[in-house]
Amino acid sequence: FNCDYSEGAHERILKKLMETNLEQTPGYGEDHYCGEAASIIRNLCKREDADVHFLVGGTQANMTVIASALRPHQGVVGAVSAHINVHETGSIEAAGHKVLALASEDGKISASQVETLYLEHIHDESFEHMVQPKMVYISNPTELGTIYTRAELEALYGVCRRYGLYLFVDGA
């Protein structure tokens, strides 16, 4: 498996596409399929008042979420191998948000790495002139195929809560 953009579709998806191929529906997320999917998402999130928007790809989704969540002086922390750092054509940085890449041998970053980066930032005498870490981005599974354990996820979440950082969990 390389990525979802380069693989074929499951036969049930192809069957459903063939069944609905000639349906005429409005575009831009205004069709009944998107309406049903949005309703399911709201229900699962237990937020009937939530806005749900569908985007055409992962890069666009990542860029939209990150650009919406961060202020211009804030950046996103991730593994050096994270696809927002390596494969998304610089879209995050093109939107004005630096990717603060942490070294990783297995594609995972640790809570202690994030905490160290954050504390080094706030204790730097010129921190106000530096990109502020505000979001932690992880891929699960990672780009290298490794999976975070529940304990690792809870530790990352704990550090994010402690320091007011957003935690963004994506899939590779």
What are these regions (language model features)?
Residues 96-143, 147-155:
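PLP-dependent aminotransferase-class I/II
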